[in-house]
């Protein structure tokens, strides 16, 4: 019941806001409406299943957001937003995205590093507190390695294109269809 990975994400950390997130998702179930699903919407309830882990519940919530047509990066940004409220240098469109979506979904705050994939995208997001390490290496021959620490795989130093680490609230994202790293601006 508590095994990972789940459908879309895995999780290194703890969702400190889990009880509140779980309660709000239960309340939302009573308010859900959808023209496409109609009465069949009841078949997907409950969204979050009692007695599952914080990670499992977050994955179930992510699955719901994806079923509404959102992309995986968009849904992850809704669940684990940056600290945007007082960010003076953030792009106004990005800030508007966070402000709008804060009315739809409250943050699932960690400390957490959350890798995720749907086959088109693979990435990881570090919560806004930034208390879980996430380091990555990109090789010249096309590999991306991410872990909580460097050196988990032996890589010829001549083959390293770049090293980095996730910053608090930031996302590392690879578009698998295009074979490229998507910058988090």
Indicate where each model-derived feature is located:
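Conserved short alpha-helical segments that host acidic/polar catalytic motifs at enzyme active sites
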Residues: 1-185
């Amino acid at each position: 019941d508590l095994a990972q990975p789940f459908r879309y994400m895995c999780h290194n950390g703890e969702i400190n806001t889990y009880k509140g997130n779980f309660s709000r998702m239960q309340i939302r179930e009573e308010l859900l409406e959808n023209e496409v699903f109609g009465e069949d919407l009841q078949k997907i309830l409950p969204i979050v299943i009692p007695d599952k882990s914080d990670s499992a519940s977050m994955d179930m919530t992510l699955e719901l957001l994806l079923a509404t047509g959102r992309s995986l990066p968009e849904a992850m940004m809704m669940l684990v937003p940056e600290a945007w409220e007082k960010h003076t240098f953030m792009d106004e469109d990005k800030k508007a995205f966070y402000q709008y979506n804060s009315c739809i979904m409250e943050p699932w705050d960690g400390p957490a590093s959350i890798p995720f994939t749907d086959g088109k995208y693979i990435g990881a997001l570090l919560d806004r507190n930034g208390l879980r390490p996430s380091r990555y290496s990109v090789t010249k021959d096309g590999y991306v390695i991410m872990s909580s620490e460097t050196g988990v795989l032996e890589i010829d130093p001549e083959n390293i294109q770049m090293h980095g680490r996730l910053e608090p609230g930031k996302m590392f994202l690879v578009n698998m269809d295009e074979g490229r790293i998507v910058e988090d601006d």
